[in-house]
């Protein structure tokens, strides 16, 4: 398939800059794969599509305040360090603009006793050492929420809450698993009361999630890697759900990537670079809750594999017409 097969026109004003409040009051477009019908609901109505014995799988990763803004030692020039992932104690893989201008061991001062030391350049990434008495507390204090570039505004204090799911638990993401943002604690409680199982996986979302596809032949695209783990109790719940012929409902493309890596390769922990595009035979996932994705993105390819490309593009064009809100802070879609 070609990259141009996954394009659609999106007016810029439909890109959400802030999320709906309360979280579960955003719009929900429901796509039925069997009869190709589309319904327009509110997110909290998602409970109507879940049955006792079904299993809802959520990604409990937690977004770290990954953007650090500091000053170069000696020159005092402003510079941004974007943390990607820890390699070992205090050594991080990062993105730094104009990294070529940095000298080995040059310091980037964030505060009096919190600074970043540039070690080396690896591909487009910069390897740094973080000097801090308490990294976690310094990141909370000085780090900025890593909002996606298309939101086109500076992060605000309230984004620390908005851009984190209510069940975030395991630190490590530099982008939010956004389908999970729509759930409130109350809605999850009601879902449990209905007899639906709730299970968790962890997949740390990397910046690669925003990486554009540059090859017209999509099969030539090199997919980014992300670290994931599926706990034993979740595996047992998946098995039980399948045995009872109930539905496995994935909340977000990150959950799909983790579960399908397990379904296809039997892997329950480690890095996954699974690239799902049509035609793909899903092994685990029966229903999918997701947001509206960027044109020509790997995430749009994944949902097109799940539902059918023509149906998805018809739904997206309908969403534009109905003025749905798009991307990370936007509205949601349920595919049954």
Curated annotation (Swiss-Prot):
Catalytic activity from the UniProt record: 7-aminomethyl-7-carbaguanosine(34) in tRNA + S-adenosyl-L-methionine = epoxyqueuosine(34) in tRNA + adenine + L-methionine + 2 H(+)
Any GO BP annotation: queuosine biosynthetic process
EC number in record: 2.4.99.17
Tree of life domain: Bacteria
GO molecular function, one term: S-adenosylmethionine:tRNA ribosyltransferase-isomerase activity
Location in or out of the cell: Cytoplasm
InterPro entries, per database record: QueA, QueA_dom1, QueA_dom2, QueA_sf
Keyword Transferase: yes
Top-level class of the enzyme under EC nomenclature: transferase
Keyword annotations: Cytoplasm, Queuosine biosynthesis, S-adenosyl-L-methionine, Transferase
Pathway membership: tRNA modification; tRNA-queuosine biosynthesis
Main location: cytoplasm
A Pfam match: Queuosine_synth
GO cellular component, one term: cytoplasm
Role, per record: Transfers and isomerizes the ribose moiety from AdoMet to the 7-aminomethyl group of 7-deazaguanine (preQ1-tRNA) to give epoxyqueuosine (oQ-tRNA).
HAMAP family named in the record: QueA
Similarity comment text for this entry: Belongs to the QueA family.
Assembly and oligomerization: Monomer.
Protein known as: S-adenosylmethionine:tRNA ribosyltransferase-isomerase
């Amino acid at each position: 398939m070609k990259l141009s097969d996954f394009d659609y026109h999106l007016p810029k004003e439909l890109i959400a800059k802030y999320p709906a409040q309360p979280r579960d009051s955003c719009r929900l477009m429901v796509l039925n794969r069997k009869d190709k019908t589309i319904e327009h609901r509110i997110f909290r109505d998602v409970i109507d599509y879940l049955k006792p014995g079904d299993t809802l799988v959520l990604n409990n990763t937690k977004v770290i305040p990954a953007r650090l803004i500091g000053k170069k030692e000696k020159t005092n020039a402003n510079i941004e360090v974007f943390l990607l992932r820890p390699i070992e104690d205090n050594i991080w893989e990062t993105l730094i603009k104009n990294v070529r201008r940095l000298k080995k061991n040059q310091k980037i001062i964030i505060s009096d006793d919190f600074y970043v030391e540039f070690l080396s350049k690896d591909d487009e990434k910069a390897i740094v050492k973080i000097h801090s008495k308490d990294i976690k507390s310094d990141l909370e204090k000085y780090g900025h929420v890593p909002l996606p570039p298309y939101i086109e505004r500076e992060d605000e204090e309230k984004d620390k809450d908005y851009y984190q799911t209510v069940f975030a638990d395991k630190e490590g993401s530099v982008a939010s698993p956004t389908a999970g943002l729509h759930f409130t604690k109350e809605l999850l409680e009601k879902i449990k009361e209905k007899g639906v199982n709730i299970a968790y996986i962890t997949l740390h979302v990397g910046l690669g999630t925003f990486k554009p596809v540059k090859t017209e032949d999509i099969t030539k695209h090199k997919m980014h890697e992300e670290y994931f783990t599926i706990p034993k109790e979740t595996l047992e719940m998946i098995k039980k759900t399948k045995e009872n012929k109930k539905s496995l409902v994935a909340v977000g493309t990150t959950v799909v990537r983790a579960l399908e890596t397990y379904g296809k390769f039997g892997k329950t922990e480690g890095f996954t670079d699974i690239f799902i595009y049509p035609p793909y035979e899903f092994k685990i996932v029966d229903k999918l809750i997701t947001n509206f994705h960027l044109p020509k993105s790997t995430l749009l390819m994944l949902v097109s594999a799940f539902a059918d490309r023509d149906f998805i593009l018809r739904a997206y064009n309908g969403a534009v017409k109905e003025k749905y809100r798009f991307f990370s802070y936007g509205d949601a879609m349920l595919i049954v």
